[in-house]
Amino acid sequence: MGLIKFSANLGFLWSELTLTGAIYAAKEAGFDAVECHWPYETNPKDISKALLETDFIMIGINTRRGDVDAGENGLSALPGREKDAKKAIDEAISYARIIKAKNIHVMAGFSYGDKARDVFIRNLKYACDRAIDHDITILIEPLNEYDAPVY
């Protein structure tokens, strides 16, 4: 049986610090790796430097949520937002390649019904087709109806 390894989710831990500061804090706290939700406001070269200096890997990142002020929490299952979803997927893959993240959570968003499911499946196929050449795994995160209705 292998050793247990712990990853710090920097979307929840050390949120008062910059993302790079949180990476160093995770190292000091004894974590083995890090992950984060939305790193896009930080220069990926700065993240790469912090990861190299801490000997960490970035487990994964999420695609952008869309218009947070309008209540969006993902774009990939939103009919009519396919162009925006593909842009978010492409951005996440480009960013992940720079920081060497191996997983991307493609955020569905708040939607329901057959059309939303079909749009989500098409966007997931799009993401997989682009990620496979870079050895990046595409993830989904099913959420429960209580915490995130129609996600």
Model regions: which residues?
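Active-site acidic/histidine proton-transfer and metal-coordination neighborhood
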Residues: 75-151
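N-terminal pre-domain/capping segments
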Residues: 1-97
